[in-house]
């Protein structure tokens, strides 16, 4: 049996690298903050759409992306090819810049520092890079092009508009959105006497379920847990707790960290308790690592908190072993004899209630140093992505959540959620996005890499080295505050 598990792990490990590199996913200055992304009251720059009409030949647009692979990368390539074939005024070249969003950002920042003529016309970067992008002054807000083209931004999910808005202006032309969810093995739940259709709703319930799974001898360390700032942020934001000042950086430039609160201390203490009781297998957030996925696939663990984009990969991992009906909402106990891994997805287990998340993911940003015709051509591609048929392709084929509201009403999308294993696994994340509170869009932080490093270092100090939670968080908070203040002074 263990040999079979190992073989499956080897088959899926390459595909899982992509999901591991794509955290749900930021650019110094004073360009705050948020709104509903309708542009009302905001002063927008001109979007040079007329330049495309005046161009002597096709605009040549370069798109930089990275951190995606498999069906997600293929979806992007297909959309670009379809766009190029649909008209003769713009030719887009999509260029893969690396295995992670961080690598793309490093190349973008290097080009910006050396010679802006080396920059692409569109760059796909995580939401964590949005503040520094805006403050760097290199991005044409797509809201300006939406206004010039007559596109109604309220067609986009409110929580997405809010999360990717700065100073009441929506910046990306398209957004690939994901959120944190709970993956679990329904077969393990059944063997432990748990209801396979009732995943834990809170972190406390997750602890209780992990004890039941361990005591039943079903899995060695029931929860596979990657140290992740995104998970911790969502735990706090779900309780209305900001990680930085000025309303999480949305009312003004963040200058002070605020996450060392009792709720954060209690959360880390509970995770440490799970370590002490052998209920959790903790992994560092190393770029490209897939070990936390493999713990679920090899059945050393029964549960995993990860980004919803992993749904497609997990569905591929078990393709041929079971059907969507067997792993779906109407779970059949007989499949325990047919498959070792019966994946399910639950809402993100919060501190007090489930599904309390803010959107993560990556936006497609128009670079304003490009010639006007190329900026107009860049918008043409992104407007093409916003068409319901292409937004639907990102969901059905690329594993991202539908951001154009009308997509959810499409019959083939609803069939996907019912009949396709990937769709069954994605549906809880879709529901989370639809229910997400636009007034809790997550933080805007300029030196986001410093914030991530300090917060995750504190988590690792507690979970690996038995550091005292309150002290570790206080030290991290002081360090992040220093980074925020230096950023504000630059």
Regions found by a protein language model. Give the residues of each.
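Glycine-centered hinge/linker elements that transmit conformational signals in sensory
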Residues: 207-210, 252-285, 348
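Hinge/lid segment of periplasmic solute-binding proteins
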Residues: 46, 50, 125-179, 235-238, ...
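Extracytoplasmic/periplasmic substrate-recognition and gating elements
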Residues: 192, 277-280, 319-401
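Long, aromatic- and glycine/proline-rich binding clefts that accommodate carbohydrate-like moieties
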Residues: 340-346, 396-450, 454, 461
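Extracytoplasmic/periplasmic solute-binding protein
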Residues: 166-175, 180, 204-256, 260, ...
